[in-house]
Structures are given as C-alpha cells and as structure tokens.
Amino acid sequence: MKIGVSGIQGDFREHKVMLERLGVEVLVVRKPEELDEVEGLVIPGGESTTMIRIMKMVNLYEKLKEKILSGFPVFGTCAGMILLSKEVVNFKQDSLGVIDIKVERNAYGRQVDSFETDVEIKGFDKSYRAIFIRAPKVVDYGNDVEVLSIYEDAPILLRQKKVLVASFHPELTEDTRVHEYFLSMVK
C-alpha cells in the first residue's frame, strides 16, 4: 500500500513517520500527478488558507477534489479538516467541500491554549490521548456523516464515505490507532 501525505504546508513529516511506522510506503505529494501514484491521502495540520492558495497555484486543488468525489480515501487533521469541510463559518475561505460538516476555525483557542485530553473513539477498546492545537470545531454536520468521537458535546472525529477528519493531531502521539483506522478505509 502506498499512501500520500500532502507536503504543501504543515506538519506532514509527522504523518509520514507515523505511516512508515505502520509499514506503509509514503509519498509526500506536492504535484497533481502524484495523486495517481497513491491509494489515499493525508492532509495535515498547518495553515488552511495557505494550503488552499498553494494547492490552487500548483493545480492540486481541482484534481484532488475530483478524485475524492469519485471515492479516493482522504484523511484531514486540524487544518486538513477545514480544507475538506463543506463550510467554514467564522472566516471567509475556500474549502474542498467533500464532507458535509461546518467548522469554526481556532475554536479551542490560540496556540497557548493547546491541550491534551483522553477521548473515547467508536470501535477503540481503550481511550485515546487527543492533542488539540488551534483546533477547529465542528458546529454542524449532515445526516450521512458518522461521528466517531466527541469532546465537550462537539464531534472531533468524523467520517463520511471515504473521507475521515479529526479536529486533533493523531500524528503527534505514539498511538497509531487513528492512522490504522484510516488505512482500513483505504484497503
């Protein structure tokens, strides 16, 4: 299995390391044609407006959207969640609109307000340590979206078909279970 990690901007190296620990071949994707070489893609945390702008500049935006809409598996964390969402409610910006969620940017506070907490995730036998850094909050979601985890009444891990999104940063932990879940979606 070969998985792509978007290398446009953000903490893509940490996702690459996590996936390699799971024995997966990883390609850092920076060009549209590289999407054809991978079976799924991770979009990391970072700065969502910068990511969108660069994706459009290098013609990755439209190709990625087209692939996702035809069933290509994708996993977005933090800024990646914002990129994949249907709508950003507190900031005017483009998004790919491939998962039926509305998000609020930086809803859990600024960088200094970052925190870790244990959360329950559907299908996991024990709690998961989630790390939130300037995290987006899901304020609404469609009927076809499955909520896999909640923190303080807000969904933090969601799935719609082959799109998985997380408000938190699973790549910053030693726990591989969220990445394993994504890989199970790709198989």
Swiss-Prot record:
Disulfide bonds: none annotated. It catalyses: aldehydo-D-ribose 5-phosphate + D-glyceraldehyde 3-phosphate + L-glutamine = pyridoxal 5'-phosphate + L-glutamate + phosphate + 3 H2O + H(+); L-glutamine + H2O = L-glutamate + NH4(+). Keywords: Glutamine amidotransferase, Hydrolase, Lyase, Pyridoxal phosphate. Its EC number is 4.3.3.6, 3.5.1.2. SUPFAM superfamilies: Class I glutamine amidotransferase-like (SSF52317). In the presence of PdxS, forms a dodecamer of heterodimers. Only shows activity in the heterodimer. This is Pyridoxal 5'-phosphate synthase subunit PdxT. One of its GO terms (cellular component) is glutaminase complex. One of its GO terms (biological process) is glutamine catabolic process. PANTHER family: PYRIDOXAL 5'-PHOSPHATE SYNTHASE SUBUNIT SNO (PTHR31559), PYRIDOXAL 5'-PHOSPHATE SYNTHASE SUBUNIT SNO1-RELATED (PTHR31559:SF0). L-glutamine binds at residues 46-48, 105, 133-134. Pathway: Cofactor biosynthesis; pyridoxal 5'-phosphate biosynthesis. Pfam families: SNO (PF01174). The active site is at residues 78, 169, 171. It comes from Thermosipho melanesiensis (strain DSM 12029 / CIP 104789 / BI429). Belongs to the glutaminase PdxT/SNO family. One of its GO terms (molecular function) is glutaminase activity. Gene3D superfamilies: 3.40.50.880. Catalyzes the hydrolysis of glutamine to glutamate and ammonia as part of the biosynthesis of pyridoxal 5'-phosphate. The resulting ammonia molecule is channeled to the active site of PdxS.
